């Protein structure tokens, strides 16, 4: 009887570990199923799709968790992400965030000539560097932006400009984005997209 109980306990622990681990949740979508699986849009290694689904690999776990919480609470607008986040409980969101934070960051594709030609380090330094770090590597105050798809970065900046996105707490991003001209938004997006990704500490 004791042996049977111990065996049962081990199986339960193993089932929970494999059934609710961050990678398994990202692959399966949890209660939401394949339609809401992270890998459907963000790729099997969190590399993004080069368009409207950003790179997740190597981003700080705390940042990733906060974005899922904000989507679930309706503080950040995106219909699919809202539903995907709501299908996960708070513990599952933590596991998914830790999974992607532990993956090695990688660029989806090499920099284009257009991106290199549009590089504007001076504009980035004055508008973004204080919070997002040199070459967009991220700081404790802002997530990494380097190697994210230019389309995605442009979309996010435009969302900040019209207050569609406003989940930064103190609204620094809201105010900064609204100061940018359309051409500057594009230049910044292309500049950041060309910078190779770099690992960041897992506890950031």
What are these regions (language model features)?
Residues 86-108, 178-204:
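C-terminal capping alpha-helices of c-type cytochrome domains
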Residues 39-73, 82-87, 121, 136-162, ...:
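Gly/Gly-Pro-rich "capping" loops immediately C-terminal to redox-active cysteine motifs
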Residues 4-6:
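C-terminal motif of bacterial Sec signal peptides marking the signal peptidase cleavage site
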Residues 14-44, 112-137, 149:
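Sequence/structural segment immediately N-terminal to covalent heme-attachment motifs in c-type
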Residues 8-11:
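Bacterial signal peptide processing site
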Residues 47-48, 74-77, 102-116, 129-130, ...:
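Inter-heme linker and motif-flanking segments adjacent to c-type heme-binding CXXCH motifs
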Residues 24, 53, 61-102, 108-112:
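Extracytoplasmic c-type cytochrome modules immediately beyond a signal peptide or single-pass transmembrane anchor
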Residues 30, 36-37, 70, 116-118, ...:
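His/Met- and acidic-residue-enriched segments that coordinate or traffic transition-metal cofactors
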